[in-house]
Amino acid sequence: MSYEPPFKITSQIIDLISQISEAVGEINSLENNPRHLELRKENRIKTIHSSLAIENNSLSIEQITAIIEGKRVLGNPNEIQEVKNALQAYELLLTLNSYEEKDLLKAHKLMMNDLVERNGKYRNEGVGVFDGKQVVHLAPPADRVPFLMADLFQWLKNSDVHPLIKSCVFHYEFEFIHPFQDGNGRMGRLWQTVILKDWKSVFAWLPIETLIKENQEEYYKALNSSDSNADSTNFIVFMLQTILNTIKEILETEKKITPKINVKITANQKKILEAIKQNPFVTQEELSGIVGIAKLNINKNMKKLQENGIIERVGADKNGSWQIKTEE
């Protein structure tokens, strides 16, 4: 008989799937957003930062951005290596097949390059999850790992449950098996994303790990309670809620930014913005000379830029300066 991971599909889970499916439709519209490529880059950096921070990597998001941009960064060499490895693994994400065990091993080989001896190979020794000195989870024996992982991938291929549920169940079962010597947390989170992007490609760019990091204690509670119940239902609910919250947060952020980005800026307004960039203290009289239009028209254009949330006045009218909030 084939393996069936224990979990229940509750009314709460059905409701969350419905909400996520609707929200995914909304987020797909961001493909046409002028900020689309920038948003992808931002989210990839957030994903890598958060997934590694959960594993106690102390590098800041600014340091990680610098590493990704090829700049030199002062820091723990192992932590810097973790960032470089994670970037390589996530860059491979779109080519990974969620049903292929060999792809999981390929991703682990990259993720743990120069960090462990058995990168890309299942562990050959016992491992446990510790809270201080206390064992909170003792993983199955090493000689069982290849069979347990084969069963899990077989279930993933053959199950007809919704991909959102499958991704959560796989994530939980993967963490329970703890198939690798190290890197199990970041690989479990990566593989959930791989499963989800095979359902809807937009998931390749959603920083779900960021909200997991923000709710790290709840993440571990959901894993532990599912261990206690021998049933992953609690973990499924936690992860689905996290996925929904991630999408909602992105939509909310983009709704605030997009109207400003989509505002039509005239040629004269562009000249005004360039002048403000050069000198935030520039006066309307000076702008009149720079742009070549009457001071009255400068005033009208400045008001329009303020109304559209593109510039704001900082300080008093007489001695203050101009600040550009959002550019075209």
PLM feature spans:
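FIC/Doc superfamily catalytic core
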Residues: 1-328
